[in-house]
């Protein structure tokens, strides 16, 4: 709506009286009287007051131009923009969001729990307990669509995994990823560990079936083990030079030798990678366990095993996995 000071800029038309005559006369205005919403009584009163004077005060009728940039149309557009801004307001951060962030931050430097100090473990246990008390999915086995995903292990207190996580167990190899893939339609679980070395990567996994035993608990029976086919690196990158005892050694003469070695390595890599994975059955009747899901939402899962060990998983692709 235009301010009073801005009305001086609006196009106006002046109705003035002819001095020689006492009777009120005016030229036809480009703006009809009713276009500025002046009532008949007001117009009549103005006319009578003018008749009593030889020189009447001019009656000024104003009307805002149609192209007023502050007019109703602009206000309408502004209101729409405000509505859009309200719809795009950021999601409110809840107490659960803060607990999840604090829990994930506490995993930093622990190598999935292997290097966690007693103080850090106590902090993690406290955060897990608080999250379990606020579990948004009290019956996880009745929400199988949430369970149906690939879950990345980010922390565990299961000591049986620590020798595997230790670098001394497998020289020149490191654990790249530990995951659990749940297929709720076929009631299957696949536990997988991926290893990475300087020249190859491989994986070891177990396939199992699960049965729902309670709103939080499932029984798992392992059926098959799989050793993945090693994916051999078929290319080696040789630097231009290396520094040894304070001197730079030029390695360009060795590039010709490396090229012939790479051709052989590429052929070997293709041969090995084309082989099928090695599978073996698990027929031991004791190869089973149960799993209790104590917290579950769209990107975080906390489970406890039969020995009381805790496992914290984050769904693959979740923003929580980003550093």
UniProtKB/Swiss-Prot annotation:
Free-text tissue specificity from the UniProt record: Constitutively expressed in flowers, leaves, and fruits.
GO annotation, cellular component aspect: chloroplast
Transit peptide feature range: 1-63
This protein's record includes keyword Protein biosynthesis: no
Pfam families xrefs: PAP_fibrillin
The entry's keywords: Chloroplast, Plastid, Transit peptide
Family: Belongs to the PAP/fibrillin family.
Protein name: Plastid-lipid-associated protein, chloroplastic
Protein source organism: Citrus unshiu
Gene name of the encoded protein: PAP
């Amino acid at each position: 709506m235009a301010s009073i000071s801005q009305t001086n800029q609006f196009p106006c038309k002046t109705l003035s009286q002819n001095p020689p005559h006492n009777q009120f006369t005016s030229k036809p205005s480009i703006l009809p009287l009713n276009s500025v919403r002046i009532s008949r009584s007001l117009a009549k009163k103005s006319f009578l007051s003018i008749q009593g004077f030889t020189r009447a005060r001019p009656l000024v009728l104003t009307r805002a131009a149609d192209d007023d940039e502050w007019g109703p149309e602009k206000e309408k557009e502004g209101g729409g923009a405000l509505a859009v801004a309200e719809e795009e307001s950021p999601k409110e951060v809840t107490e659960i969001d803060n607990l999840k962030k604090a829990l994930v931050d506490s995993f930093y430097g622990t190598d999935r729990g292997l290097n966690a100090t007693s103080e850090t473990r106590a902090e993690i246990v406290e955060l897990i307990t608080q999250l379990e008390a606020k579990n948004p999915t009290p019956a996880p086995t009745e929400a199988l669509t949430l369970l149906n995903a690939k879950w990345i292990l980010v922390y565990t207190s299961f000591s049986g995994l620590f020798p595997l996580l230790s670098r001394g167990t497998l020289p020149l190899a490191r654990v790249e990823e530990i995951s659990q893939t749940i297929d709720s339609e076929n009631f299957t679980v696949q536990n997988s560990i991926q290893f990475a070395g300087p020249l190859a990567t491989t994986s070891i996994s177990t396939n199992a079936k699960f049965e729902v035993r309670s709103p939080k608990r499932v029984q798992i029976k392992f059926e098959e083990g799989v050793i993945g086919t090693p994916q051999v690196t078929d290319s080696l990158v040789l630097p231009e030079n290396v520094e040894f005892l304070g001197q730079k050694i030029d390695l360009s003469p060795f590039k010709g030798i490396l090229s012939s070695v790479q051709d052989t390595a590429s052929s070997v890599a293709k041969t090995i990678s084309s082989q099928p994975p090695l599978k073996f059955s698990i027929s031991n009747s004791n190869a089973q366990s149960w799993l209790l899901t104590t917290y579950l939402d769209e990107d975080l899962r906390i489970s406890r095993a039969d020995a009381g060990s805790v496992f914290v998983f984050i769904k693959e692709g979740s923003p929580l996995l980003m550093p």
